[in-house]
């Protein structure tokens, strides 16, 4: 007999970055109970996990109904991922493009592992929806962010656990400007400001340099995508207001 999953409960993959913070707000707008899960896998930008507490505290001030919906925050340590991944996210090496056309920040299998662990936790807690911030519009080309990958994994998870999880990727077809716009739609300028100030995207874990779009080195692929999206979003917002 399969586990009973509650369709009004969601588990959000919440790293503390811009995308996952936006997905968390999206989930709070749609589900009755929302829990979060983050992963410590020896990443260089571990400061990202530290951002989660400030984001959660800030989200609770935006809408009264979100306070009651927010459930437990889970953190899983999976150091073995770093042990099998010789990448710029888990090693102190310069970020560069590889011969395969992927940046050396690609951690093979990372999202596959994250979603599988998330599903195992959701199964135990009776949570029917799993939400991730994967996107194949503005992204670095990671194959485990693609829609086809996530759908195939979702089918495998449901077969392997004899369940019917719903895997949601609300950012899949949004560029970074549209992701900023979604945050504005969900929580207004206060949510945009919260994500800008307290979410962390930079692969190098840089929190000393402040930019219009938030904190980061400004040079790594993640910072460049975030900055480009912010410029486009700001221009669109100014045009509407002007």
Curated annotation (Swiss-Prot):
- Any note on cofactor binding? Binds 1 zinc ion per subunit.
Q: Give the EC class as a word.
A: ligase
Catalytic activity annotation: 7-carboxy-7-deazaguanine + NH4(+) + ATP = 7-cyano-7-deazaguanine + ADP + phosphate + H2O + H(+)
Tagged with keyword rRNA processing: no
Tell me the domain of life. Bacteria
Task: Give GO BP annotations, semicolon-separated.
Answer: queuosine biosynthetic process
What is this protein's record name? 7-cyano-7-deazaguanine synthase
The UniProt gene name for this protein comes to queC
């Amino acid at each position: 007999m399969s586990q009973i999953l509650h369709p009004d409960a969601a588990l959000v993959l919440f790293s503390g970055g811009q995308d996952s913070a936006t997905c968390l707000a999206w989930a709070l707008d749609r589900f009755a109970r929302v829990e979060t899960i983050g992963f410590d896998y020896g990443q260089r930008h571990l400061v990202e996990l530290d951002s989660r507490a400030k984001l959660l505290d800030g989200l609770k001030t935006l809408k009264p109904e979100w306070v009651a919906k927010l459930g437990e925050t889970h953190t899983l340590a999976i150091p073995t991922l770093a042990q099998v991944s010789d990448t710029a996210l888990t090693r102190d090496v310069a970020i560069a493009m590889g011969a395969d056309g992927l940046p050396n920040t690609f951690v093979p299998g990372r999202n596959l592992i994250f979603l599988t662990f998330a599903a195992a936790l959701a199964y135990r807690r009776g949570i029917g929806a799993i939400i991730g911030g994967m996107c194949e519009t503005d992204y670095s080309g990671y194959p485990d962010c693609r829609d086809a990958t996530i759908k195939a994994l979702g089918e495998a998870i449901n077969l392997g656990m004899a369940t019917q999880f719903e895997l949601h990727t609300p950012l899949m077809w949004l560029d970074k400007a549209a992701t900023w716009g979604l945050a504005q739609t969900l929580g207004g300028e206060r949510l945009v400001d919260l994500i800008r100030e307290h979410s962390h995207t930079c692969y190098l874990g840089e929190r000393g340099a402040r930019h219009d779009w938030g904190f980061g080195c400004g040079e790594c692929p993640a910072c460049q995508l975030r900055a480009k999206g912010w410029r486009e979003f700001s221009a669109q917002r100014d045009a509407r207001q002007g």
